[in-house]
Amino acid sequence: ALAAIPEPDDGDLFFDFEGDPLYTEGQGRWWGLDYLFGWVDADGKFDALWAHSFAEERTALERFIAFVLARRAQHPAMHIYHYAPYETSHLAAMAARYGVCEAEVDGLLRDGVFVDLYPIVRRALRVGSRSYSIKMLEPLYMGEDSRTDMAVTKGDQSIEVYLSWRTAVAEGREHDAAEILQGIADYNEYDCVSTLKL
């Protein structure tokens, strides 16, 4: 199973989305917004794109794909690691939704640039838990750097916290809104670093 993991490359990225599945606009033509595209590089440097509307999500998708293509031109052997199929299925769905970057996303998928670590872990490890959630595996490799002191610790909680950000913005509580977004960013960064360390 471990032979499925490509050789490391300086261009490798470790990627994670945060999303709100209940977000919609107007008449509800579309549902679900991936509001945070987050990644770390092989050195653990975090970067992110935010999207708080469908228009911003489209822009974030275009910017992310442009970034990946430029990085791949510099690092042809790079891969983008993620855990479970959410990231790749949502990138493809976004590209189809907006009619942008479809060929580019398809090419990255066909070329095997994205590497889902979940099936590799399922085949390679036997753990004392029914769940192979990355959060259940983290005690094996994250050491003392745990999620317990973070404002956001679980995916479903991040959705609730994101909704509280929208409320804070609507009520004009800018300081609270900034703190809430930082908590979500910290959670996403931890997920990306966890994927890197895994």
What is each stretch, according to the model?
Residues 15-18, 40-42, 81-84, 187, ...:
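Generic beta-strand/beta-sheet core signal
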Residues 7-10, 31-35, 73-78, 143, ...:
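Short, well-ordered loop/turn elements at secondary-structure boundaries
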Residues 30-44:
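Short conserved beta-strand segments at catalytic cores or DNA/RNA-binding microdomains
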Residues 41, 47-163:
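Conserved DEDDh/DEDDy metal-dependent 3′-5′ exonuclease domain
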Residues 1-26, 70:
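Long, highly charged low-complexity segments
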Residues 22-25, 91, 197:
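Short helix/loop capping segments that flank catalytic or ligand/cofactor-binding pockets
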Residues 154-157, 163-198:
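Mixed-charge, glycine-rich, non-catalytic linkers/tails in nucleic-acid processing enzymes
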Residues 2-5, 56, 184:
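Helix-loop elements that line ligand-binding/catalytic pockets
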